[in-house]
């Protein structure tokens, strides 16, 4: 069955706007669990302005849901991850500002650094995923760097301004998912997915996990997080049960 991971960045961002303890990331994880999420994604950025090591430890120790860290492949981040030993780590570019990076890692040009990070994480028994654009060369580089999974960056698909452009980007995701599986990599997809555009992605037979945050948290403002996660989960399961994705 296709998995869903709830990205907690917007929950942490809302907390950071006023400081203090609310909204509580652990309460969000409990609601996500009730809604059927399989894990939560905790982004730990260089500035630690949103989520930080304390949040990750708190969530990990709670055991409510498996924790996947989202980090840049720096020495400091890798050292923390190997000490925490979450269920998984997604290696991503460090954002330049407040917005998430609009692309995956350029694994081909940063192979040495990423390979070192992936090796240390794998040695600690952590599932290592590398965020990449849907590009054959990047997939080959991620495989060579020691990734066990790739998280295909769906940003261009999600931001497509026309249906023709959307189909073009979807086909790129589809080809990349198949190529990644042929390389022996597990396939995750994330970034920019909402309740509408996720159905094509979830119907791809090679996709094992979908991750999302913004659309789910936005809906949660009106329905509650439990119900918002459940609605996304239902959408994924229904789409994955279809025989073939709509091109």
Residue ranges and their predicted role:
Residues 1-86, 141-143, 168:
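Conserved N-terminal beta1-alpha1 strand-loop-helix module at the mouth
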Residues 2-8, 40-42, 67-71, 89-91, ...:
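Hydrophobic faces of well-ordered beta-strands that scaffold small-molecule active sites
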Residues 4-25, 66-73, 100-108, 122-134, ...:
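Active-site mouth loops of central-metabolism enzymes
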Residues 36-38, 62-65, 83-89, 123, ...:
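Glycine-enriched alpha-helix->loop->beta-strand junction motifs that scaffold or abut catalytic
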Residues 60, 103, 162, 166, ...:
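C-terminal helical cap(s) of enzyme catalytic domains, especially alpha/beta-barrels
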Residues 74-85, 135-145, 189, 193-207:
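Catalytic cores of alpha/beta
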Residues 90-98, 148-161, 205-225:
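Glycine-rich phosphate-binding active-site loops on the catalytic face of alpha/beta enzymes
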Residues 127-183:
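Histidine/lysine/aspartate-rich catalytic loop segments that bind and position anionic ligands
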